[in-house]
């Protein structure tokens, strides 16, 4: 299902089967080169819906870039199937790559869970069924690292990258100052919590998240477009 939000801007709701999040908001900015903001899990149900939406918009995949607001598989998973160029923060890209190519990543995570009171059996189970394991991206194209405050031009949008660590170490939001539109990823959600968790690269993820909230609080926003559920004017 495609929903027009503004001229040149659309939302495709991507189902997330058997997941309490239910769906992901994938935003598409149409232009000479089009931009897909967040993609869904690397699984057939998600791919089919995203591909169908892009085809309905008349987009050629060779003219599409993907931007992941952060590393989670529900946002990054399909990048490798629809684009050759991926835009993502450097810190989140490094974590995502490590989680795929380094076996010790999950071993260390399981050990951390156990040290902090998780039953060993459950900790090992989590490492096997974690979405980052089951639905990870198979991306093999060019990765373009996003920098805080840089401007991206797609279609009739001028997007300022805003570093908003908290939900993940390298989470970013995108802000069009003229249109007063904020793409908030999972930094700001209206119907559910953004879920702030421990990251080994962050000493205080909750503190960082609160600082990031202050950062976007000063923006003049007409419409906030989150990664999940409803968006609000």
Task: Show which residues each predicted segment covers.
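Alpha-helix C-terminal capping segments
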Residues: 29, 78-83, 213-216
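Metallo-beta-lactamase
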Residues: 41-44, 133-136, 158-233
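A short catalytic or substrate-binding loop motif that flags glycine-/basic-rich loops and adjacent residues
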Residues: 19-21, 144-146, 165-168
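Short Pro/Gly-enriched beta-strand edge/turn motifs at strand-loop
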Residues: 7-14, 130-135, 155-157
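Conserved beta-strand hairpin/beta-sheet module of binuclear metal-dependent hydrolase folds
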Residues: 2-57, 174-184, 190
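Active-site HxH/HxHxD metal-binding segment of metal-dependent hydrolases
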Residues: 45, 54-152
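Accessory terminal helices/loops
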Residues: 1-4, 102, 116-118, 123, ...
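Residue-level marker for buried hydrophobic side chains located in beta-strands
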Residues: 35-37, 67, 86, 181-183, ...
């Amino acid at each position: 299902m495609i929903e027009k939000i503004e001229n040149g801007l659309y939302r495709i709701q991507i189902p997330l089967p058997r997941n309490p999040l239910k769906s992901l908001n994938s935003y598409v900015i149409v232009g000479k080169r089009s931009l897909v903001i967040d993609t869904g899990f690397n699984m057939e149900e998600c791919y089919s819906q995203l591909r169908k939406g892009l085809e309905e918009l008349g987009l050629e995949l060779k003219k599409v870039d993907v931007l992941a607001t952060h590393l989670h598989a529900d946002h990054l998973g399909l990048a490798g199937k629809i684009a050759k160029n991926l835009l993502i923060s450097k810190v989140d890209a490094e974590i995502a790559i490590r989680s795929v190519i380094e076996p010790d990543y999950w071993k260390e995570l399981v050990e951390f869970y156990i040290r902090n009171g998780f039953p060993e059996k459950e900790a090992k189970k989590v490492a096997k069924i974690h979405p980052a394991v089951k639905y990870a991206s198979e991306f093999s194209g060019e990765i373009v690292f996003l920098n805080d405050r840089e401007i991206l031009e797609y279609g009739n949008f001028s997007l300022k990258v805003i570093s908003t660590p908290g939900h993940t170490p390298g989470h970013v939001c995108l802000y069009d100052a003229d249109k007063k539109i904020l793409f908030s990823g999972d930094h700001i959600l209206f119907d559910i919590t953004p879920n702030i968790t421990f990251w080994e690269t962050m000493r205080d993820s909750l503190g960082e998240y609160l600082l990031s909230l202050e950062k976007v609080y000063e923006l003049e926003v007409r419409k906030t477009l989150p990664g999940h559920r409803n968006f609000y004017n």
